[in-house]
Amino acid sequence: MTGKICGTGSWAPDRVWDNNDLAKMVETSDQWIRERTGVVQRHIAKEDEDTVTMAAGAALKALEDAEMKAEEIDLILVATISPTEIMPCVACGVQERLGAENATCFDLNGACTGSLLALNTAQAYLAQGIYRNALVIGAEKLSGLTDWTDRGTCILFGDGAGAVVLRAEEGGSYAQVTHSIGKKGGALTLQSRNQIRYENDPKAKETYIQMNGKEVFSFAVSKVPEAVKELLSREQVSCEDISYYLLHQANERIIRSAARRLGEDISKFPMNMDRYGNTSSASLLILLDEMKKSGKLQRGDRLVLAGFGGGLTYGASLIEY
């Protein structure tokens, strides 16, 4: 059994901040941001728009696309590093809003690799016949975890959610490789805010996303192509057999570098970070939804999905659409 993609959806806040808005907050410019990241704008959630709001919004659209009722879903898995609450989990909040009373629900924290890890997890459950219909969501409200005085990070991130409905069916194919490098975890961190015990705690700065940009960039441009090559080699699939490579939308330069290292044309690497920025766990599923809605995906297409991020973690999966 394999989880077949039968519906996708995405949701982003209406409020948009472009690069010129950020130039009023920190020393930067539209040109500087575009040249280094490819980002032009990002969606920023309002106070009453939390991770559950976005996750449920994307999930509803995915269910509509799949022509499936919420009661038919028996697994809801949410990848996020920005939950509204530690408990209950975001997935339970989504269950409540959808009325998916038959679903088992839990969250997964895999940072920017989160949606890939969530897909792997859901596929494993479906393959074993434990569940029949899975709703996988990546949702982030990164604006609340971003230091808006730090030019090195605030230009990157945005808010949003993506979702996919997987139905267990005979046939199809799914394969994946994932790796973790815990010893390099310090390159990209977000300290728990539960550790702040008193006012004016000197650790307060650490409660925002902290990143060694050069180290993360070097990691991504080398390890992502490495994972893709490992996956295709193991599955005895050539690059020519791949219709599209959907990579985590962190930085345009990373994706262009991956295309070069794989010897593939950049046209096979769709990008949308110009409109969303880096949405961490949400980015792959937002991109997948846009590809489906635009009519670019055809049944039988072979897709490579690749993620990389905090941990450090990285990996790739091969799925037949």
Predicted segments with their positions:
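Conserved beta-strand elements of the Class I
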Residues: K4, D74-L77, L135, S243, ...
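Acidic-glycine-rich active-site phosphate/pyrophosphate-binding loop
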Residues: V26-E35, E85-G99, L135-L142, Q195-P202, ...
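Flexible, glycine-rich active-site loops centered on histidine and acidic residues
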Residues: A127-A161
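Short acidic, glycine/serine/threonine-rich loops at helix termini
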Residues: V16-W17, M87-C89, T146-D150, Y314-L318
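Claisen-condensing/thiolase-fold acyl-transfer catalytic domains that form or cleave C-C bonds
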Residues: V52, A56-A59, L63, S82-P83, ...
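Condensing-enzyme catalytic core mediating Claisen C-C bond formation in acyl metabolism
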Residues: M1-E47, D150-S218, S222, E226, ...
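Short beta-strand segments
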Residues: A79, N109, A134-E140, L166-R167, ...
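Short glycine-rich phosphate-binding loop at a beta-alpha junction
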Residues: E71-A79, C239-H248
